[in-house]
Design a protein with these regions (language model features):
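Signature of N6-adenine DNA methyltransferases within the class I
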Residues: 176, 180, 190-192, 198-212, ...
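Short, conserved SAM-binding/catalytic segment
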Residues: 66-75, 531-543
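Core alpha/beta nucleotide-donor-binding catalytic domains of modification enzymes
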Residues: 4-147, 158-162, 166-172, 549, ...
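C-terminal target-recognition/interaction regions appended to catalytic cores
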Residues: 261-421, 729-856
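Non-catalytic DNA-recognition/assembly elements of restriction-modification systems
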Residues: 422-423, 432-434, 446, 492, ...
Length: 856
């Protein structure tokens, strides 16, 4: 829970903000942590976002933010240490003020750029002080988890993700793992190391960007708000319009920040003769090589980095800006023509900082009106702080692009299912020709919306349930696939492609693989035709090659082994077409099921190295899939995602996704849950343990504690399928017990609910009357049990349990244990926190055992 101190609303609340807060789109808000001078998040201000709070340790940098009116209220500028609760409480107080004053229910964006000391996992024991420093990263993670903004952004050095931190659990782990384990249950997260020069920044800057989108924000993925690729710009294009500065100490008359920073005059000879791309160390005249004189002896400077004293190229991308951009002995700081380091203005332009950004509370016009001596005094006082903050900053254009895209996706109206149905009805899109025409001519909707319309139109035409896979769900699944660096050529199969929901995220993930071949298969020729029309709406890179195949993937002879198989196979049992069922079963090891998805699992395991499928959650526990699970558990199950009922809107089915590597032996499995909103990692053998009848993906130490106190596999279960309400009546010879009648070691009488029947002739359930049986309500997480009384029977809402070994003695203590909170929590884990697959069958009855020591 967020703690906050008492807050006080400002006496005068700005009317414009109040009006905006009452608009249909509301305010757009953000918090910035470790914000330095606010150069990066100035881009959010430019896009109309309001800064709720900004936190910076150094007051001189925080002041620069105030010069730019970043926060509406002074209390939003927080100078403090993020490791202290006092600083955090100030942030929470600001959030509370905006919540109460402006009806901001959710913070839109949390930005964090914490100091990070790059360090490999292998070397973490050698540099524990660096791990402590990286605790600031963990503080950022904790703030995201507490505040739960709609989006979060982390920006940092190239080695950020592989650097080590001490996580909230006290263990040292990579920063990427810490982010994933703490935030992966709540957010879809994109991790990317990119050079900002490819994304609109005028200079080279290789950095790590981590963007998270809260999972309850449907149809939006981190890819949707990632900066867009743009052509590189040369240094000449960026700063070539500025006047040349030839005289040391010279300050441009019209721009105080375009200045020739002074240095020791003897150093000018070191760079005056070098050409673009050359270093002072390339001078042939030894007197022009960087040196010092100690006790009359010339000592030449060491050339530790090849980019010291190096003149830059006019017609190449500008170099990376570092904190020591004030000296020639730093990296790539020498102007292409002038004998000086880049001016502040040039560095600003190279970091995409707009002219409107203020470094002082003195207006820019007044600064330019100062006398030369006054200008020099101003720069002497402020220049180093300005240059250092620029060297540490996020380029403004990068955050501005993200802000722009976040604002757009938040303001865009959502295409609801009702809207979709209306479009289909008005345009008569159940007709294939009409649908194709609509897709090809409509420019108002993007791929995701058009595919949703197409999926629902197909479903209405075929009279089937629509299993449209949302783009956020696709991102979750695709993000678990192998990384780009593993491949130079990549072959992907989507065996039941439908309208191709996975294609955009697959293309985005593997855009940097040199060659990507994607085979898409569907049994329905119309689906393939519709997909081809939809693909025209996607920008397909030249490295992506899509082949369309109309076929039944279960019977098709695939000619190659695929690197990745991904998809959402049909979920249905074949009951009428016995010939087709026989063909499917002929190829399958599991002969106990008629469900198509189980056949898909086996077939895809035979043609793919890595297999990722969305399937019904019943896979992990139903008896009919025992053989399928046995086949799968022999290979490495890298990931399991439990979507619960959140996988498909409007379809009441629980689903999971698994990623299975057919080439590898079992190892660790990462489990992500939409139910518990967390991520955890455990040995595969732990969750697929043969001592239990099925997989237990939520198994933990608490579960094991209860399991160790019990004897299992005591009962077999039976449920009646015949006795219906029509067969029963309010009174009669034999009582029919129903789920609400079952109490803790007792029968509960309920007026106008109790039922009876006079005759059991021909009913299979009759064999249990007046036998030693236990009764358990079916479909409940509040288990309770009692012995079945004489002259009673139970309908299908109650499971009838009998002992496998007649000699086993069942006591009231055993049954009473089922009604305890301890067993209820245990049973929830035993049923994998399911909501629909709760029938007590001969697998799940396993967990109703006897106590090893009879004491409640």
């Amino acid at each position: 829970m967020i703690k906050s101190k008492a807050y006080k609303l400002p006496e005068e609340i700005e009317e414009a903000i109040v009006a905006e807060s009452r608009s249909s789109y509301g305010l757009h808000t953000y918090v910035s942590l470790f914000s330095s001078a606010g150069v990066g998040c100035y881009g959010f201000k430019e896009e109309g976002f309001y800064c709720v709070a900004t936190v910076e340790l150094l007051e001189k940098r925080l002041k620069i933010q105030s010069y730019n009116n970043k926060c509406v209220y002074k209390s939003g500028y927080i100078c403090g240490d993020m490791t202290t609760q006092a600083t955090k409480d100030k942030v929470f107080a600001e959030l509370e003020m905006w919540k109460k004053g402006f009806h901001v229910t959710d913070l839109d964006v949390l930005i964090a750029t914490p100091p990070c000391q790059g360090m490999s996992v292998a070397n973490h024991k050698k540099k524990k002080d660096e791990i402590i420093r990286n605790s600031l990263v963990v503080e950022s993670i904790k703030m995201v988890h507490q505040i739960k903004p709609k989006f979060f952004i982390f920006e940092n050095v190239r080695a950020f993700l592989t650097s080590v931190c001490t996580d909230v659990d006290g263990n040292a782990k990579s920063i990427k793992e810490a982010i994933e384990m703490n935030l992966g249950g709540l957010y879809n997260i994109l991790y990317k190391v990119v050079n900002f020069k490819d994304y609109g920044n005028p200079s080279s800057r290789t950095r790590t960007l981590v963007i998270g989108v809260r999972k309850d924000i449907k149809e939006i993925t981190p890819c949707d708000v990632f900066p867009g690729k743009q052509p590189e710009r040369t240094l000449r294009q960026v700063i070539g319009h500025l006047p040349s500065l030839k005289k040391m100490g010279e300050i441009s008359e019209n721009d105080i920040y375009h200045n020739f920073r002074k240095y020791n005059p003897k150093m000018e000879a070191w760079i005056s003769e070098i050409k673009e791309g050359q270093s002072a160390f390339d001078n042939t005249d030894i007197n022009r090589i960087p040196h010092t004189v100690k006790n009359g002896v010339v000592v030449y400077n060491a050339q530790k980095n090849g980019d010291k004293y190096t003149r830059q190229y006019w017609d190449k991308v500008a170099p990376c800006i570092h904190t020591r951009n004030d000296i020639m002995a730093s990296q790539n700081t020498v102007h292409p023509v002038d004998n000086r380091v880049f001016s502040i203005r040039e560095v600003m332009l190279m970091m995409s900082v707009p002219e409107s950004f203020n470094w002082s509370d003195i207006p820019f016009e007044k600064l330019n009106a100062l006398t030369p001596k006054e200008k020099e005094a101003f720069l002497k006082k402020e220049e180093m702080n300005i240059r250092q903050t620029l060297g540490e900053a996020v380029p403004t254009i990068i955050f501005r692009q993200i802000a722009n895209k976040i604002r757009r996706v938040l303001c865009k109206p959502t295409l609801t299912e009702q809207d979709t149905k209306g479009i289909i009805e008005r345009r008569k899109l159940t007709d294939i020709d009409n649908l194709l025409r609509f897709i090809r001519t409509n420019n108002s909707y993007k791929f995701a919306e058009l595919s949703k319309i197409a999926e629902l139109a197909n479903a209405q035409r075929e009279n089937n349930a629509a299993y449209y896979t949302r783009q956020d769900t696709c991102f979750t699944i695709v993000s678990k696939l192998p990384e780009v660096k593993e491949y130079t050529t990549l072959d992907i199969l989507e065996p039941s492609v439908g309208v191709g929901n996975f294609l955009p995220t697959l293309i985005q993930k593997y855009a940097d693989v040199p060659v990507v071949n994607i085979d898409v298969v569907d049994i329905d020729e119309n689906s393939i035709t519709i997909l081809q029309a939809l693909v025209e709406k996607i920008n397909i890179p030249q490295n992506i090659h899509i082949r369309y195949i109309v076929a039944d993937s279960l019977l098709y002879n695939f000619e190659k082994k695929y690197d990745i198989v991904i998809g959402n196979p049909p979920y249905m049992k074949i009951t009428k077409d016995k010939k087709l069922l026989a063909l499917y079963k002929e190829q399958a090891q599991n002969k106990d099921t008629n469900n198509i998805f189980a056949f898909f699992i086996e077939k895809m395991m035979s043609v793919g190295n890595v297999v990722s499928l969305i399937v019904p959650k019943s896979l992990i526990n139903a008896p009919e899939f025992n053989q399928t699970r046995a086949i799968m558990k022999e290979k490495r199950i890298a990931n399991i995602i439990d979507f619960g009922e959140k996988g498909f809107k409007g379809v009441k089915i629980e689903t999971i996704n698994f990623v299975l590597d057919t080439r590898k032996a079992p190892d660790m499995t990462t489990i992500e849950s939409y139910i518990t909103e967390d991520v955890r990692c455990c040995p595969q053998e732990y969750i697929t343990d043969d001592k239990f009848p099925y997989w237990l993906i939520y198994r933990d130490s608490s579960f094991d504690k209860v399991a160790n106190e019990m004897n299992f596999n005591v009962f077999k279960a039976y449920r009646d399928r015949v006795i219906t309400k029509a067969r029963t009546k309010a009174s009669g010879r034999i009582r029919v017990l129903k789920s609400r009648n079952i109490g803790n070691n007792k029968i509960v009488n309920i007026a106008d609910y109790d039922s009876y029947i006079d005759d059991l002739d021909g009913l299979d359930v009759a064999k249990y009357m007046n036998q030693d049986c236990i009764l358990l309500p079916n479909l409940t997480y509040n288990p309770r049990a009692c012995f079945m009384p004489s002259n009673c029977i139970a309908d299908g809402s109650v499971a009838i349990l009998t002992t496998i070994d007649p000699s086993v003695n069942i006591t009231e203590d055993d049954l009473a244990f089922y009604a305890t909170d301890e067993f209820s929590k245990f049973y929830s884990v035993a049923r994998n926190r399911g909501t629909r697959s709760l029938n007590i069958d001969n697998n799940s009855v396993f967990f109703f055992g006897t106590l090893k020591q009879h004491s409640i």
